[in-house]
Amino acid sequence: MRPSGRNNDQLRTLKVTHNFTKHAEGSVLIEFGDTKVLCTASVVAGVPRFKKDSGEGWLTAEYGMLPRSTHTRMDREAARGKQSGRTQEIQRLIGRALRASVDLTKIGENTIKVDCDVIQADGGTRTASITGASLAIRDAIDYMKQNGMLDEQTSPLMSQVAAISVGIFNNEPVLDLDYDEDSNAETDMNVVMNSNGGMIEIQGTAEGKDFSEEEFAKMLGLAKKGIKEIFESIF
């Protein structure tokens, strides 16, 4: 039995609020159960030096957690003077996943800067960030079209992206782990896919106990089922 009472193949309740903030070109509050992440996509003129004069755009992502998004307060990373390795790893993952969905040759020399800020954490913050950010990017691209920054016929979005966590909890494969499950899981895996059914990234780690190829296949099957439901529900 899962602590939440959910079936092993059951997602948490999903909720998306578009235009959650008024300044960003795209903004989405995404909620997976008690995990809540604010995802914004800002369009900035210009590109990094390595992209200058290429005619192409760029997309980058940042990730952070509010001090009391967790059970006990943590200091802001800005106050500590550096980002943790975990934060750097997560924002690289978010950036990679999102760049796989956007044709950067079609947005001109503009940069889409994605910010994912965890308001409340209850497991799956990185996968929620990827999913919410993909929606925010779609809204930002619509803004660019409506404001003459892109031709109405231009479609930089090659696909949408969604992600979900799976794992082995109490010796059983489960979908969409919350904090209680994630902190006690024998295996934790994150899967990122696009709306065309393609795989973008799989991260899987055994926590003190290995997992079999059969268990991997079951977890992957759960992830594919969950991501399909996410696309049908909120995209």
UniProtKB/Swiss-Prot annotation:
UniProt-listed Gene3D superfamilies: GHMP Kinase, N-terminal domain
Keyword tRNA-binding: yes
EC number annotated for this UniProt entry: 2.7.7.56
Pfam families the UniProt entry points to: RNase_PH, RNase_PH_C
Recorded superkingdom: Bacteria
Positions contributing to phosphate binding: 86, 124-126
GO terms classed as biological process: rRNA catabolic process; rRNA processing; tRNA processing
Keywords on record: Nucleotidyltransferase, RNA-binding, rRNA processing, Transferase, tRNA processing, tRNA-binding
GO molecular function list: 3'-5'-RNA exonuclease activity; tRNA binding; tRNA nucleotidyltransferase activity
Catalytic reaction equation(s): tRNA(n+1) + phosphate = tRNA(n) + a ribonucleoside 5'-diphosphate
Class in the EC hierarchy, top level: transferase
Record's subunit section: Homohexameric ring arranged as a trimer of dimers.
Family: Belongs to the RNase PH family.
Physiological role: Phosphorolytic 3'-5' exoribonuclease that plays an important role in tRNA 3'-end maturation. Removes nucleotide residues following the 3'-CCA terminus of tRNAs; can also add nucleotides to the ends of RNA molecules by using nucleoside diphosphates as substrates, but this may not be physiologically important. Probably plays a role in initiation of 16S rRNA degradation (leading to ribosome degradation) during starvation.
Name of the molecule in the record: Ribonuclease PH
Native species: Francisella philomiragia subsp. philomiragia (strain ATCC 25017 / CCUG 19701 / FSC 153 / O#319-036)
